[in-house]
A protein has these predicted regions:
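Accessory nucleic acid-recognition modules appended to NTPase machines
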Residues: 1-148, 155
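Catalytic cores of nucleic-acid endonucleases
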Residues: 131, 155-168
Length: 168
C-alpha cells in the first residue's frame, strides 16, 4: 500500500528510534547506528544473526524521516560552499517524545536546547544546515532569501574552556 513502509524487524526500528533520540544533535552515520547497536549488545534478542545491513538501517531511518518523527540536517562546507555527504545530525520533532522514550535527564541538556533552536529556525522559515570550516563546526547556518545567520548554541558560557571552544 502506498505510504506504508515494510518494517520487518520492529525491535530494530525501536532500537534505532532510541539511538537517534539519545543522540540528537550528534554527528551520526548510518553505519555507526548499526555498529553501535551491535557493539553495545542492544540487539541481543537471541534471534539476530549478525549486524543489520546498512540498507535496512537506512530504510528504517528514511521511514522515520518521512513520518516527521526525526529531521535530518546536512553538513555544509562553508569554505567549499557545498553540502557534504557525511555525518549529518538528527533532531526529534518533539523533545517530549524524547523524554518519554528515554526518561527525563539533564546530562545532555545542551543537545536538547540545540534541538529546540533547530525547530524554531525551521518555524521561522529558515533553511538550516550545519556549518563546517576545517575541523571547526558552526551549530547552524540559517538562510532565508538574502539573509544568512551563523548560530552557536551552548548551555552556558561561564567556563573559559566553553567560551574558547564556542567562539573559535
Amino acid at each position: 500500500r502506498r505510504g506504508q513502509k515494510q518494517i520487518t524487524d520492529p525491535t530494530l526500528l525501536r532500537k534505532i528510534i532510541l539511538f537517534l533520540a539519545d543522540n540528537i544533535g550528534s554527528s551520526v552515520s548510518i553505519s555507526s547506528i548499526g555498529n553501535t547497536l551491535i557493539n553495545e549488545g542492544l540487539l541481543d534478542d537471541g534471534k539476530r544473526k549478525g549486524a543489520p545491513s546498512a540498507h535496512t538501517v537506512q530504510a528504517y531511518v528514511n521511514a522515520l524521516l518521512e513520518s516527521y518523527f526525526f529531521y535530518e540536517i546536512k553538513r555544509f562546507d562553508i569554505k567549499g560552499k557545498a553540502y557534504l555527504r557525511t555525518l549529518g545530525k538528527y533532531y526529534i520533532v518533539d523533545i517530549g517524545l524524547r523524554n518519554y522514550l528515554l526518561g527525563f535527564r539533564n546530562r545532555d541538556s545542551g543537545h536538547a536546547i540545540e534541538n529546540v533552536v533547530y525547530f524554531e529556525l525551521l518555524r521561522r522559515g529558515y533553511d538550516v544546515a550545519i556549518g563546517k570550516i576545517g575541523s571547526a563546526e558552526v551549530d547552524f547556518i540559517a538562510t532565508k532569501a538574502d539573509a544568512k545567520k551563523y548560530i552557536q548554541v551552548t548551555e552556558s558560557m561561564m567556563s573559559e574552556d566553553v567560551r574558547n571552544r564556542e567562539l573559535t
